[in-house]
């Protein structure tokens, strides 16, 4: 049922776009790698004091590199691998399974007219992004 997956992914993108959701996926591994590399280079250049200076500079650089990289949630959702999209669709189907639709436009209209269903899908999406993707969510004004 690739059409159903596409319909539900478009619905989730519409909901997150309407709420202007952005998420920053934490790249702690990248930051740690930068900090470690800088400590190593500092140690080679300056000995033990160089390790301290390199680690400090690397830690600050790593934190700066990985902070504030917010992307729109619809973009993140569409970039998910197919297995993750199916997982998300299965969670959404538990909420919208009783609806009958023919295409993404009709499905979106049905859900957008039902505030309770919209809230449940938004909560499911927020939980998925924060827990599964380990991302921080921000809503634009």
Curated annotation (Swiss-Prot):
Membrane-crossing segments per the record: 33-53
A biological process term (GO) from this entry: mitochondrial calcium ion homeostasis
Gene Ontology CC, one term: mitochondrial membrane
Primary location recorded for the protein, binned into one broad class: mitochondrion
Keyword Flavoprotein recorded: no
Similarity comment: family membership: Belongs to the C19orf12 family.
PANTHER family: NAZO FAMILY MEMBER, PROTEIN C19ORF12
Name of the protein this chain belongs to: Protein C19orf12 homolog
